């Protein structure tokens, strides 16, 4: 089975809400996920996260701490997703690749249709984040 390794940014604001994005393309169109993407050869997870967030959201983040790694078997591939708690370094965000986005409080995390791998991250967030 094909293996894909990605990083995901769990971007939090001052109120503890997390930033979620809705896919606008492909088989999983309209499902929600945490922004991020594939690591390139020679990149650290932190470098990959900063690059992906610049590409997807036209903003800068600080990578604050490792949260969890999720392994999930999709029908076509095995996904390994390394998730990091992050903060915005600027106030501007622009959706370059997603059709929608929203800030979700801990209580609102169940209100969107998450991609299967991201469901596991939501469970970790609910249990670990105050």
Predicted segments with their positions:
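Generic C-terminal helix-cap and adjacent flexible tail
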Residues: 1-2, 126-130
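Conserved N-terminal beta-strand and adjoining loop/helix that marks the start
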Residues: 1-18, 38
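Conserved Nudix-box catalytic region and its N-terminal flanking loop in Nudix hydrolases
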Residues: 17-55
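Short secondary-structure junctions
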Residues: 56-63
């Amino acid at each position: 089975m094909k293996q894909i390794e990605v990083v995901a940014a769990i971007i939090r604001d001052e109120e503890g809400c997390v930033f979620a994005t809705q896919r606008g393309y492909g088989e999983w169109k309209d499902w929600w996920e945490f922004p991020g993407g594939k690591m390139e050869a020679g990149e650290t997870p932190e470098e990959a996260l900063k690059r992906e967030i610049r590409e997807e959201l036209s903003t800068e983040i600080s990578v604050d701490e490792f949260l969890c790694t999720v392994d999930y078997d999709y029908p076509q591939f095995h996904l390994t997703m390394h998730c990091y708690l992050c903060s915005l370094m600027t106030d501007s965000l622009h959706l370059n690749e997603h059709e929608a986005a929203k800030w979700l409080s801990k209580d609102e995390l169940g209100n969107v249709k998450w991609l299967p791998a991201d469901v596991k991250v939501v469970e970790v967030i609910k249990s670990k984040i105050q």
